A protein has these predicted regions:
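SAM/dcSAM-binding transferase cores
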Residues: 1-11, 202-301
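Generic hydrophobic alpha-helical segments
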Residues: 36-37, 195, 227
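Alpha-helix boundary/capping detector
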Residues: 37, 41-42, 56-57, 124-125, ...
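Residue-level detector of alpha-helical recognition elements and their boundaries
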Residues: 44-45, 113, 203, 247
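Short, intrinsically disordered/low-complexity patches at protein termini
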Residues: 51-52, 134, 252-255
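Hydrophobic transmembrane alpha-helix bundles
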Residues: 61-66, 79-81, 150-153, 197-203, ...
């Protein structure tokens, strides 16, 4: 019979190949962090990633299988945190792909918005190490309290309870946003250090589920005062209501349905008139296909 340690090692390799991970430190973190510690007492309710995708888009109800064996948690599955509200500890493979895109390094300062109960925040913390620091933010009071308790063993990790979009995380090397937005929050761009990476879901609202959006995970990197952008993965996710502009929903839906958003190369913050390269244009922010070198310089903070 496999021990928990065996299961964690196998799980880390499963996630590695599922998400095509390039970071040995991230793979090791998946093998070290005990998932069961973060999920509350058994029985745990386990669901498949496919069921989760259909559930969050309103196509079908979520189905769970109960288990009391912690070894069952070490697969690429979601685990219910609040069945009534359809809140889960997310799919390990998807989160791994997003965290991998952060290009975390030892000593980095990271911000995780929508940290849930802190499991993936702990994985980030393992990668940056005690020489770095991590701030998690969670709007759900109960989950935030659980995250703070779960992460108390990491002295370099703190948890903010409340709307993460209204919270100033300070200067960061890496930010992971776990809630759908129509655009990058200006403060997040300002707080990125030179070379800093922001990974976030840019989504359009789904008509059957007004609190859920579908779109892309994008990676934004600050280099030379400009913000470079690239596609990471498709996504369906709960929305961050405070970083959604109703005026951007229509152009965003057009850019997504035409697949033009996959060609995004920069986030422009310089004043300019709408142009053919503008995918989603707003005052002070533009998702653009223009090369970053052709955009105006962002002011460092």
């Amino acid at each position: 019979m496999m021990t928990l340690e065996d299961c964690r090692s196998f799980y880390a390799q499963e996630v590695r190949w599922t998400a095509n991970l390039s970071s040995p430190a991230l793979i090791d973190a998946y093998a070290r962090v005990p998932r069961e510690k973060y999920l509350g007492p058994p029985p745990w309710q386990i669901g498949s990633a496919d069921d989760r995708a259909m559930s969050i888009s309103g196509m079908a109800d979520m189905n769970y299988i109960p288990t009391e064996d912690p070894r069952d948690l070490y697969h690429n599955v979601v685990v219910a945190l609040d069945v009534a509200q359809n809140i889960n500890n997310g799919q390990p493979g998807a989160l791994a792909r997003w965290i991998n895109a952060l290009d975390l390094r030892a000593g980095d300062r990271a911000y995780h918005l929508g940290c849930g109960v802190g499991y993936y925040t702990a994985i980030i913390a393992e990668v940056v190490g005690a020489g770095g620091s991590v701030v998690g933010s969670e709007a759900h009071p109960g989950l935030a309290a659980r995250a703070a308790e779960n992460l108390s063993g990491y002295p370099y990790v703190s948890v903010h309870a409340g709307d993460g979009a209204q919270f100033d995380p300070g200067a960061c090397d890496a930010m992971l946003v776990n809630a759908g937005v129509t655009h990058p929050h200006p403060l997040w761009l300002e707080r990125l250090r030179e070379g800093g990476r922001l990974v976030l879901p840019i989504t359009m609202t789904l008509a059957p589920m007004p609190t859920v959006g579908a779109g892309i995970m994008a990676k934004i990197t600050r280099r030379g005062g400009a913000f470079w952008a690239e596609f990471v993965s498709p996504v369906a996710i709960f929305s961050c209501s405070s970083v959604r502009d109703p005026q951007l929903e229509a152009p965003l839906a057009k850019a997504l349905s035409s697949r033009a958003l996959l060609k995004m190369k920069s986030v422009r913050v310089d004043p300019h008139e709408p142009a053919d390269t503008c995918l989603v244009h707003a005052s002070g922010m533009c998702l653009s296909t223009a090369e970053p070198a052709a955009t105006g310089q962002a002011k460092a903070t």
